[in-house]
Amino acid sequence: METKKNNSEYIPEFDKSFRHPRYWGAWLGVAAMAGIALTPPKFRDPILARLGRFAGRLGKSSRRRALINLSLCFPERSEAEREAIVDEMFATAPQAMAMMAELAIRGPEKIQPRVGWQGLEIIEEMRRNNEKVIFLVPHGWAVDIPAMLMASQGQKMAAMFHNQGNPVFDYVWNTVRRRFGGRLHARNDGIKPFIQSVRQGYWGYYLPDQDHGPEHSEFVDFFATYKATLPAIGRLMKVCRARVVPLFPIYDGKTHRLTIQVRPPMDDLLEADDHTIERRMNEEVEIFVGPRPEQYTWILKLLKTRKPGEIQPYKRKDLYPIK
């Protein structure tokens, strides 16, 4: 359930129906994650890695999507290398989620010693100059943690999101996201509420990975293939009068540390045409994800929209048929 203000801010609210027995399994899962989050990371991370890899073998559809994406983006890598990336991706996912839960339950002071920022001076300069900012954030598994940390330090944050299929998970997940303040805007409400928040001084959090279809997108190079890409970030920076700053979080399950990489503002986009903007967006994703592909959510249908006459890769029966 949700309550909406006049700025279309999404505020998750507990609904009485969440007590129904059909949701007990979801609540058990939430309780389990909370318990895991309170376990020291040196104990939980190896266990979560094994569980994640096991789940990745069972989740055949998700695994297939990831392998298809990797085969198109990294054709130069061997099949064994791509399988290893997928295994590490499934290992990283629960580890990053556990850190997010730990942050929400125990507070930022407990995880700060395990967080390192590369390029923090860029953010500090923006704050000193009171500049409007939109972070360009590839969809990694630890994607929510940097925004939560900045919100915990008093920085007003605004982000757009998709609702989860399970209403209990949706309620809990978005409550955790708002743990330290900030605004959430449902994508179903359109882009205007997000723009309004950035204009009001909230730092925006924008994920560029979604496939919006062929109507408003262009086909632009993405790793070794191409992707339907929307030049939205260029328009947003002009409409919001904001600077665009690429950011990407990397969780290392061996050191139990999160590294948040921040790159210089994309000021070159101000006078760029749509094609250049789209390519620069994808280029930033490549710079972040290329060295650490296991951090990225390859299970998404990133390459769904194809050029006329080309079959959607996820519908091709010759690509990684499920046995």
Swiss-Prot record:
Per the annotation, the residue ranges of the short sequence motif HXXXXD motif are: 139-144
Catalyzed reaction equations: an alpha-Kdo-(2->4)-alpha-Kdo-(2->6)-(acyl)-lipid IVA + a fatty acyl-[ACP] = an alpha-Kdo-(2->4)-alpha-Kdo-(2->6)-lipid A + holo-[ACP]
InterPro entries registered for this protein in UniProt: LipA_acyltrans, Lipid_A_MsbB
Q: Which domain of life is it from?
A: Bacteria
Membrane topology qualifier: Single-pass membrane protein
Where does it localize?
A: Cell inner membrane
Q: Name one GO cellular component term.
A: Gram-negative-bacterium-type cell wall
Give the knockout phenotype.
A msbB1/msbB2 double mutant is impaired in its capacity to cause TNF-alpha production by human monocytes and to cause rupture and inflammatory destruction of the epithelial barrier in the rabbit ligated intestinal loop model of shigellosis. Mutants have no defect in their ability to enter into host epithelial cells.
The membrane spanning regions, by residue number, are 23-43
Q: What induces it?
A: Active under both limited and replete magnesium growth conditions and is independent of the PhoP/PhoQ two-component system.
Q: What is its main location?
A: membrane
Q: Does the keyword Transmembrane apply?
A: yes
Provide this UniProt record's keywords sorted from A to Z: Acyltransferase, Cell inner membrane, Cell membrane, Lipopolysaccharide biosynthesis, Membrane, Transferase, Transmembrane, Transmembrane helix
Q: Which pathway is recorded for this entry?
A: Glycolipid biosynthesis; KDO(2)-lipid A biosynthesis; KDO(2)-lipid A from CMP-3-deoxy-D-manno-octulosonate and lipid IV(A): step 4/4; Bacterial outer membrane biogenesis; lipopolysaccharide biosynthesis
Recorded hits in PANTHER family, A to Z, give: LIPID A BIOSYNTHESIS LAUROYL ACYLTRANSFERASE, LIPID A BIOSYNTHESIS MYRISTOYLTRANSFERASE
What NCBIfam families does UniProt report for this protein, alphabetically? lipid_A_msbB, PRK08943.1
Q: Could you tell me what this protein is called?
A: Lipid A biosynthesis acyltransferase 1
Identify the gene encoding this protein: lpxM1
